[in-house]
Amino acid sequence: MEGGYEQGGGASRYFHNLFRPEIHHQQLQPQGGINLIDQHHHQHQQHQQQQQPSDDSRESDHSNKDHHQQGRPDSDPNTSSSAPGKRPRGRPPGSKNKAKPPIIVTRDSPNALRSHVLEVSPGADIVESVSTYARRRGRGVSVLGGNGTVSNVTLRQPVTPGNGGGVSGGGGVVTLHGRFEILSLTGTVLPPPAPPGAGGLSIFLAGGQGQVVGGSVVAPLIASAPVILMAASFSNAVFERLPIEEEEEEGGGGGGGGGGGPPQMQQAPSASPPSGVTGQGQLGGNVGGYGFSGDPHLLGWGAGTPSRPPF
């Protein structure tokens, strides 16, 4: 009985050891660890499944935005390829340094002056040459200066007053024989339909002994050597009479209350009748051996001056 009890007692101790809490804890721990790994793996799969729809929706939003930007008219493929979804701000580099195209005037202004250098051949009439040039070009010519040599010049000179305040010699035409150097030549030549007498040339000449004479040119003016003229041409010239009409009306009203006197705008009579080129025969005489015909008082040289050699 004791042996059987001992055997039974040993078996009870063996079974008692099997049911100890430490053994149960050691056996349950690996099983619990496996369950925790499986649970963590399951949670990770659920999290990935939740993120996948959000990523798909985000990609669809990006595709819609790109499609919208490509449909816009101001989208640039170059900028969209370099920085998608962004537009460059500011001015492109180097845009301020671009060369501007030059301004080219294709036609002249009708009121502009043109400069000309005119050469008159020897033996030609200077007045006729300039008049023909103005008529063919249809432009007015303003002669600013000239140099050269002319011969047998015909001038119209003004009236010279006498010592007592009266007129000692009437205005007329004087012809100078010989060769003369041009000191100054100015005036204007207008093409038709300009009124007659609107233009004219004035000249100053020097003789061989240093004498200077001048006046208005009466054609012809023959060039004995090449004559160079500096001139300017113009067009669209407007001819106007001065004073203007408003002043004429005011002057006419004021003159009417003056007791029957002549109107203020009436042209005053000339002090001496004008003489043409044909009036040279009326100016007989010779001044101290000078080779020109006319009144000796026209050039300011009196009849009592001593004789001088010709030019």
Curated annotation (Swiss-Prot):
GO terms for molecular function: double-stranded DNA binding; histone binding; minor groove of adenine-thymine-rich DNA binding. Expressed in the hypocotyl and the vascular tissue of seedling. Changing residue 91 to H: In esc-11; Exhibits a long hypocotyl phenotype in the light. It is found in: Nucleus. PROSITE patterns: PPC. The keyword Transcription applies. Residues 55-75 have a biased composition (Basic and acidic residues). Residues 86-98 bind DNA. GO terms for cellular component: nucleus. Residues 40-105, 246-311 are annotated as: Disordered. InterPro entries: AHL15-29, PPC_dom. Residues 252-262, 278-292 have a biased composition (Gly residues). Residues 263-277 have a biased composition (Low complexity). The keyword Membrane does not apply. GO terms for biological process: chromatin organization; flower development; innate immune response; leaf senescence; negative regulation of innate immune response; photomorphogenesis; vegetative to reproductive phase transition of meristem. Residues 110-258 form the PPC domain. Transcription factor that specifically binds AT-rich DNA sequences related to the nuclear matrix attachment regions (MARs). Negatively regulates plant innate immunity (PTI) to pathogens through the down-regulation of the PAMP-triggered FRK1 expression. Acts redundantly with AHL18, AHL22 and AHL29 in the regulation of flowering and regulation of the hypocotyl elongation. Acts as a chromatin remodeling factor that negatively regulates the leaf senescence. Acts redundantly with AHL29/SOB3 to modulate hypocotyl growth inhibition in response to light. The PPC domain mediates interactions between AHL proteins. Overexpression of AHL27 results in a decreased flg22-induced expression of FRK1. Overexpression causes also delay of leaf senescence, late flowering and modified leaf development. Homodimer. Interacts with AHL12, AHL25, AHL29, TCP4, TCP13, EF114, ATAF2/NAC081, histone H2B.1, histone H3.3 and histone H4. This is AT-hook motif nuclear-localized protein 27.
